Amino acid sequence: MINNWLAVGLLVVSGILAFNWKRKHPYGQTVEIGEKPENGGRIRRNSACADHLISFLEDDEIYTLYDSLVKSCKKYGERKCFGERKKDSNGNLGKFEWISYNTYLERCEYIQQGLCELGLKPKSKVGIFSKNRLEWLIVHSASFIQSYCVVSFYETLGVESLSYVTEHAEIGLAFCSAETLQKTLDIAKGVKVLKTIICFDSIDKEHYNIAKELGVTLYTYDEIMKKGKEANGKHKHTPPTPDTLSTIMYTSGTTGPPKGVMITHKNLTSVVCAVSDFIKVYDTDVHYSYLPYAHVLERVVILAAFHFGAAIGIFSGDISNILVEVKLLSPTLFIGVPRVFERIKTNVFKEISKKPALLRTLFNGAYNLKYLSIQHGFKLPIIEKVLDLVFFSKIKQALGGKVRVILSGSAPLSFDTEVFLRVVMCCCVLQGYGASEGCGGDACKRLDDESVGTIGPPFASNEIKLVDVPELGYDSNGEVQTGEVCLRGPSISSGYYKDEEKTREEFKDGWFHTGDIGRWNRDGSLSIVDRKKNIFKLSQGEYVAVEKIETIVVKSEYVEQVCIYGDSQKSCVIAIIHPHPESCSEWAGSKKTDKDIKEICKNQDFIKVVLDDIIKNCKKSGLHGFEIPKAIHLTPEAFSDQNNLLTPSFKLKRHEIKKYFEDEIKKLYSKLD
């Protein structure tokens, strides 16, 4: 409490000394266009492109990803392009080793020539089933040269989902790694269309024998490279048009089989061109690429970084190495998802809690001062520089010390975590918003906007309108304009591959209906406030937005993951929780009890501690009584894509969680009744 009052006092004095400088908060970020539609509010565009939406870079004649590939390599030549860490003879990873833009283009040329030698025709589907690696990117870029359509797989998907995608997309040739080779062969057992498999690594005799029995031809990546070199450029390029299908992005799907989002060269090129209006990528930038390449957000970021000549360091694949690699690379751009940033915040405060009392007091005072200045919109340039130097510079080194922009995407970033990143990382923090159907880039906060909690205006490649959701009280023409976010423009997909029914359901009159509830703010920016599909009614008629509750519950030091569950025949919600392993261990140590997480999750005393902490946080955040979980079940097993409780992009599979914990849910409600 003393720290807070001290911070408030310093804030007032500092505000006077700083001549009441306010943080940048630009107004007029969007403009309304056209007449008011029959259904919903006025259409809004980014104020920078009121007259037109961007679909290409006319000055540079960039109309497709093929144009971007060729012209970027010509422009940046011998500059560093992609870097990765190689293992030595002892299996230890070394420093990042780099190839130039010229070398990258040369390898892309060899691969596409090699595929032509195999008889692969333009516009054929090419599957990629591997974790992040340089060869993945080379195959992806090589596909532009012959207008191939790339279909990527999350490495952790099961054979059933992989087989569905392979058959549905009619993939006759697929690339894989040594780790995924056996699973790829398993797919070929049941999917006869898959006839050729190319492994990025060496292949043992056993796998050659299995392939022979299946009637599948196996090659190594090096063999295709060799064929491409020997072809000596005899196969002419077959460049795509803007409307050529570039990729089919199969959404992982929280229910039912994956949907194949059709994404053209125009869709992706328009997003890449529009990115420069938000992040301002330079040829001096360095990007650390660790989100899966099957994730549309990471794909777009790489395409943009490549287009503007940045250097891109590739994740080695071991999660425990991420912070080591970040320090080695010292990126200027750090793109992540809320789960990563929440974990960074938890770890920082855990380390601070171990410091001596005096240091904790000083740090908390400095943190609260900067937090309050951001929260209330004051800018204290001199004082903030001193605080950054004395208190936060070492924390910033955790991300290499040179990060100038942090971008969070995939899911909403909580207010506290966004401010935390602004305070301790001493850089610009942006929230982006995007769906696979919108190529992952549909809205983003501007670099010159220092407010918190918005996703900014639309990209210059799409426009947005809100549609009424009367059953939930959302009015797109009300005093506060709210409604379902709908997208339209050059970057938006035309629909789902071979699925007209789903396309008609979610793409109406040219607009993609996201299922997200948005709110237009006074400055013209957009905020995501709810999820239409994850809102349900309790027995007393109250509506509950589960993601809003989960954002608050996960702030508890004891909670690693949470799924809020409710039933229309019940009057309250409950929570399925995977507790934070370290917090479990620390609590058990303090009570001198069994430290096995399975036993701790059954311990009624610990369950009460966790529930009490959750209730405290919920009340502090202003939740209504019906929104606060009345009972919890602790599970020692994390939600993951391996147990089918998470999608590969870290979204909860609520239907599967409900089935998986059906007995536990019944027991919790029976105790409450």
From Swiss-Prot:
It is found in: Endoplasmic reticulum. The lineage of its organism: Eukaryota, Amoebozoa, Evosea, Eumycetozoa, Dictyostelia. PANTHER family: FATTY ACYL-COA SYNTHETASE B, LONG-CHAIN-FATTY-ACID--COA LIGASE. Its main location: endoplasmic reticulum. Residues 1-18 form the signal peptide. Belongs to the ATP-dependent AMP-binding enzyme family. GO terms for molecular function: ATP binding; long-chain fatty acid-CoA ligase activity. One of its GO terms (biological process) is positive regulation of phagocytosis. CDD domains: LC-FACS_euk. Long chain fatty acid acyl-CoA synthetases catalyze the formation of a thiester bond between a free fatty acid and coenzyme A during fatty acid metabolic process. Induction: Down-regulated by Pseudomonas aeruginosa, PAO1 strain and PA14 strain infection. It is an enzyme of class 6 (ligase). Coiled coil: none annotated. Glycans are attached at residue 267. GO terms for cellular component: endoplasmic reticulum; endoplasmic reticulum membrane; membrane; peroxisomal membrane. Its EC number is 6.2.1.3. It comes from the Eukaryota. Gene3D superfamilies: N-terminal domain of ligase-like. It comes from Dictyostelium discoideum (Social amoeba). Keywords: ATP-binding, Endoplasmic reticulum, Fatty acid metabolism, Glycoprotein, Ligase, Lipid metabolism, Nucleotide-binding, Signal. This is Fatty acyl-CoA synthetase B.
